[in-house]
Design a protein with these regions (language model features):
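Small beta-barrel nucleic-acid-binding modules, primarily SNase/OB-fold domains
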Residues: 2-126
Length: 126
């Protein structure tokens, strides 16, 4: 799969989702960071709530992730459960924020009205 990045090809992986935190899960043996999503870390006030919300969304189901890049030791992508955009859903439910630096603002309009008052955002996403 990593070869497709070097060749500029589209990559997609599918498998059972095992949630790590509110914006990272393991799929088909790869750690996948949800592109454009900023959820609090487990050490932050809403981190466990975000993780539990993502677990409720994916329910250990088979998901498909369209990989768009790499970040540290993870791949980055948009993941789907059927036709549902999981990245959008965790934001829509109010457990994560749009990270405009990486999403281009794609998810900002679906954030709940109070999300930016309740959740911490990483400086690089502002």
């Amino acid at each position: 799969m990593i070869l497709c990045f070097w060749l500029g090809l589209f990559c997609s992986i599918s498998g059972q989702a095992i949630v790590h935190d509110g914006d990272t899960m393991r799929v088909a043996g790869y750690s996948v960071r949800l592109a454009g999503v900023d959820a609090e870390e487990l050490s932050e006030p809403n981190g466990y709530a975000a993780r539990d919300a993502l677990r409720a969304i994916v329910r250990a189901s088979t998901v498909r992730c369209e990989i768009s890049g790499k970040s540290y030791n993870r791949v980055v992508g948009t993941c789907y459960l059927g036709d549902m955009d999981i990245n959008a859903e965790i934001i829509r439910r109010g457990y994560a924020l749009d990270c405009a630096r990486y999403s281009g603002g794609k998810y900002r309009t679906i954030e709940p009205f109070d999300a930016r008052r309740r959740l911490l955002q990483k400086p690089y996403c502002q």
